[in-house]
């Protein structure tokens, strides 16, 4: 009997496996994505918005501040999780509700202005319909992602990735302009300054619709990288694949 027990007692005790916490995944990639989004927004809208704030009308000023503020909000939210301040994160999350509603309302207004005459100078429909289509299709994704993030807020993994998707859904205009200025530098597009009926100088971005191709490639590539790392770390859930399919179909 003792001979049978001895080997069992000599076996080392195994400790239960501890779940490894990936600190880099503090908010579904929201922290680095928000930083990139802010930089791209500043670069894309600097020539026509941030450097001309004294010439921007009230409607564009309000939307621009709300959209830029949303990027900062997600950055702060991701940072609060990173420094372990969940209470502040929740408070700021609920305060984001009226901000988001205003963002959606002004986004709809911007789409209407884009597809209509502004300052007596109508935007060519052949150009506007391509560029405007991306906003029309991205807006429902923005709403779905935010509402889903609120409803599924107790599922931290899904919640964080849905908030990251709100960044990408609202980033298309900035990314398009960012690539557009690169195309201008390469001589593939041009900028025209014309005086409207109201006497104000308007900047016309000829060929802006062509920038939508690298824009969608950029967004799809960002999502593909996010999906790969989630899959590699055995934490892949539905938000990123859903967003990838959404953008791919619309593209």
What does each model-found stretch correspond to?
Residues 2-251:
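Alpha-helical membrane insertion/targeting regions
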